[in-house]
């Protein structure tokens, strides 16, 4: 599924991005292929909302906000808007291979 670039709709499930993206909100996502993920990391912007896989749940997509990017190590630091979110404050930096896509709309 991740061998090409495509767009899709996903529904927010959970409160980690509340209040900006409450549970049930529909998002338009530009999915990033596994081949393009290293090239996509330098194009990310701080505070951009992304879809990632977490180290502890690699089969579950999560929505987070990019807070830091380490291009030398090909890593990103992501956090949920909700302070109770499980994110890089728990996991540390995520490898670029955990990047699934970028939220295109809404782009809060």
Where are these regions (language model features)?
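Extended hydrophobic leader/signal-anchor segments used for secretion and membrane insertion
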Residues: 1-108
